[in-house]
Structures are given as structure tokens and as C-alpha cells.
Amino acid sequence: LPVAFSDEVGDKPLPVRLLDEPLAVCRLGNRVAAFRDLCIHRGTPISLGWIKNNEVVCAYHGWSYNADGRCTRIPSIPPEHPIPKKACLTQYQTKERYGIVWVCMSEKEPRAPIPDFSPLEDPNFHVLFRDKRHWNCSAARAIENFFDFGHFACVHDGILGDRNQPIPPEVTLTREDNELHFSATRSASQSHAVHAVEHKNNYRVTRPFSIHQWKVEPDGKTEAFCYTVMPI
């Protein structure tokens, strides 16, 4: 699941919340790591600390943790004393792709790969990132909104739909592994745009909460949208 844009993770820990779990996302050297936002020592949020020598340092007692979550330094004990093996942060699987930091909170292999947002890496596309938006609804309802064609005529009259033509287009679904594929054709009469033309929107929905939508314009150019939801 997504937790942050890559450029949000800088020279200090980034506090985020995923599935009701507070996390601290840190850039440590050439790696991005995600930890439970809790120092193993006295329960201080590790996101209150700082990053030094590619390690995250707790703000309370100065314990240092490396990118694997293992404590490497406790300032209050002599250096010759061993650090307990259990002195580790809870760490989660983390990957960086498409300018987004993705986290899997299970210790097992992720059930599904990161969604295919290949246009974000295609030099033929001009890529724009939109600001994150907070929706007061479930993650499933948020992603469903993008292909819930029944609401277009009512909510988006004159833009994406027409209240005089409320019947949504028929679609045929195909399923491939953890993805749903379908297309929907929007007629020119369902838009009030000056140069409205009939066009087909293609959709690939990737479980659990991602969708890739694209359409080919009359001039041959492809417009693509990539959406993903971070359930907090």
C-alpha cells in the first residue's frame, strides 16, 4: 500500500498512518525504511527523532537504529557493553517505485505486486503528481468512485455525464490474477464540452486499492490517470 511520495521522505523521519498503525518512514542511505513509530526502549515515537550517519536516532534517550531496525548505539551505556538483541524496531517491507513509497505490513510475501503504473516511468508521458486528498470514507468506496458510472450524470452533469442520459455504459469485465480489466465508451452527447467526441476509457483495477485509467485522444495522444488509496 502507498504511504508517501518519494520526495516527502527527506532528512528527517516522516510520520504517517497506515491501517490505523503509526509508522515512521525514513531515508537511510540509499534505502527507504518503514518502522512502527515506537522506540523499543520507552515507547517514544521514533518520528520525533532525527537521522544521523544513515541511522534514525530516538529523541528521548538517543538510541540509534540502522536501516534493518537494529539498535547500534545506546549513549547511556559504556561502548564495551553489548546491546541486547531484542533492541530492534518493528520494521515493515518497503519498496520505492513510481515516485511512491509502498509498504507491506505482513512478514509474509505480499499477496500482490505493486500496481502497474508504467506511464509514470515512460519518457513519452508528461507526468504530473496531484496533491494527496483526504476522503472521509472507506478505501474501497474511494477507489470504487472512479468507475461508478452511475453517479456521473447526477454529480458531474455537464462534465462527465448528462442528467438527461443517466443510464451508464455497459461494460464487460475480465479478470487476470488480482486485476479487473474493462472499458467504457462515453458518447459525445453525454458531454457539454465544445469539442466533445466519443471516446473509450480503459480501466485496470488492481487489488486492493489502485486503478489505472487511460484513453486515446483523436490526435493519437494517450492520456492516463493512476490512482491509489492509502487507508489510514
Language model segments and positions:
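C-terminal catalytic domain of Rieske-type non-heme iron oxygenases
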Residues: 109-232
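Rieske [2Fe-2S] iron-sulfur-binding domain
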Residues: 3-122, 127, 224
